[in-house]
Amino acid sequence: MENFQLVLLLIGVIAIIGVLVHGFWSIRKQQPKEYKQSPMADISRERRDAQGFDNDGIGAVRVVKNTQQDDEPETIDDEQRDPLATETVTDAFELSGTPATKVNKTRVEPSLIPQESVFATDMPVQESLFGADEISVAAPVITEQAVRTEPEPRLQPVFKPEPQLEPVELKPDPIVEPAPKQEQTEELGEPRDVLVLHVVAKEGEELSGAELLPCLLTLNFKFGEMNIFHRHEDNAGTGKVLFSMANMVKPGVFDPDNMEQFSTQGVVLFMTLPCYGEALMNFSIMLNSAHQIADDLGGVVLDGGRDEWLESTKQNYIQRIRAQA
């Protein structure tokens, strides 16, 4: 792209130079010969009339020599010497090789004639610098007819009557209401296995209901059927139930309105197999919830047999899940 711009720039410069050269050549060709010659050539020439005066009205200096002093010219004071006359005398001595002729002893002063009479009578009229070929440019004459511009005729718009279209009654399309999505009810059948986790208080302590309720709400548990808490597919508490949490003490229910006065030895989290969704993902959520409750309330996580939760126990639960897949 840069090379293309450079080529265009060079072409433009060459075109401009060509136009300028052609213009100067055309102007030079149309000029008369008098324009081509220097107009100062004739002025620089020394012209003298019949009485010996040049264009400035200055005559040639006449040198008067004494008969007794032939070899010594008469000196003239610097104040009386005319600079133009001095230059003329100097040029005359340099160009002329012959000695000046002797004249009478008396000094003859040049008679000064008014310049107006000289120029009026004897001085030839100086020709025009441009000669007869002087170019006269005629100014354009503006006539009244040219000034008076005829008003343009106004064109009247021609409106063609459009054919009137008969109104067509547009019937609105019937609004098709989307059919309500029918929840896919999967028949899980009878549960074949149950995964159980216990969160119990330490020896001599109890789990406080005032601390348990905020923890359950943070973990997206929702109080529901059978008066226990459930964990649903959606965090807002909608969808299928993934797993549930009950009170470890009989009858195993909760009273949300009296949770501040509630206390228990522990809670139990359980998940049936098969279940809705991915069983491994559901078990991972249940295990993390159990650990979070134990950390917030100061409890301990145990397995279904109320034994200490170990990594081997976790692997055993995973194998049970895969067996039911």
From Swiss-Prot:
The chain crosses the membrane at residues 7-27. It holds the Pfam family ZipA_C. GO terms for cellular component: cell division site; plasma membrane. Residues 28-325 are cytoplasmic. It is a single-pass type I membrane protein. It comes from the Bacteria. One of its GO terms (biological process) is FtsZ-dependent cytokinesis. InterPro entries: Cell_div_ZipA (IPR011919), ZipA_FtsZ-bd_C (IPR007449), ZipA_FtsZ-bd_C_sf (IPR036765). It is found in: Cell inner membrane. Residues 165-188 are annotated as: Disordered. Keywords: Cell cycle, Cell division, Cell inner membrane, Cell membrane, Membrane, Transmembrane, Transmembrane helix. Gene3D superfamilies: ZipA, C-terminal FtsZ-binding domain. The keyword Transmembrane helix applies. Residues 1-6 are periplasmic. Essential cell division protein that stabilizes the FtsZ protofilaments by cross-linking them and that serves as a cytoplasmic membrane anchor for the Z ring. Also required for the recruitment to the septal ring of downstream cell division proteins. Interacts with FtsZ via their C-terminal domains. Belongs to the ZipA family. PANTHER family: CELL DIVISION PROTEIN ZIPA. This is Cell division protein ZipA. It comes from Shewanella pealeana (strain ATCC 700345 / ANG-SQ1).
